[in-house]
A protein has these predicted regions:
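HDAC/HDAC-like amidohydrolase catalytic core signature
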Residues: 1-236
């Protein structure tokens, strides 16, 4: 089992924002650990894996930043240019609930790179299976509009990279999260080579996506499956 991670992705923070509000006046800055999408839970997982000895049973690896060529298969140049410019000039709020600090572009590209490396390692037979522990996350990010703390569409970038190398044909994405994977859904909504399946809490986030009736369109009709669950649903 390959375990792909990089401490630097845990340094991603909200910059000069408190949650999604600009700091100033009565708005006090908050640490990265105070964000709803916090690095501390991920760092805690790594620590537990180390002290229990589990880390020694894994093939631990890191990765490079996803190259621009890979990012452009999902995100338009205009989006990447805007993101990079803001990142180089101290960060800011790029979309809906996506504050980031200086260097956020490079950390998002590194997060995407970890996903790319994990997928490629499995498809080439280098490892049997893999897990990429990285942030910022990606399943809410649309090609030209980030939201929900997601700045780049990590899994879509990884899928397109694998396809470009001839490593993957038909792909299934299983998104298990309290939130609907609206970004991943939108990217592949009209395609029949990628099946997207999302388990999520009904009516959570985003409020207007994730309906059972949303099944794809055109060639992608039937290749998008939403399984919204009621709040409080258990394991049975």
């Amino acid at each position: 089992t390959g375990f792909f991670w990089d401490e630097r992705t845990f340094w991603h923070g909200g910059g000069n924002y408190a949650f999604t509000l600009p700091v100033g006046g009565l708005i006090q800055p908050m640490a990265a650990g105070g964000l709803p999408e916090s690095p501390e839970t991920k760092r805690r997982l790594v620590n537990l894996m180390q002290v229990t000895g589990l880390m020694g049973e894994l093939d631990v690896r890191t990765a490079s930043e996803a190259p621009t060529e890979a990012l452009l298969r999902v995100h338009p140049q205009s989006y990447l240019d805007t993101f990079k410019k803001m990142s180089d000039n101290g960060g800011g709020e790029l979309g809906l609930r996506v504050p980031f600090a200086r260097g956020g572009y490079e950390l998002a590209a590194l997060s995407a790179g970890l996903s790319m490396a994990a997928v490629e390692a499995v498809l080439t037979g280098d490892v049997q299976n893999a897990y990429a522990l990285s942030r910022p996350p990606g399943h809410h990010c649309l090609p030209d509009y980030p939201n929900g703390f997601c700045l780049m569409a990590n899994i879509a970038i990884a899928i397109e990279a694998a396809k470009a190398k001839g490593l993957a044909g038909r792909v299934a994405v299983l998104d298990w999260d309290v939130h609907h994977g609206n970004g991943t859904e939108a990217i592949f909504y009209d395609r029949d080579d990628v099946l997207t399946i999302s388990f999520h809490q009904e009516g959570n986030y985003p409020l207007d996506t994730g309906a059972l009736a949303d099944r794809g369109k055109g060639a992608g009709e039937g290749y998008n499956i939403n399984l919204p669950l009621p709040a409080g649903a258990g394991h049975t």
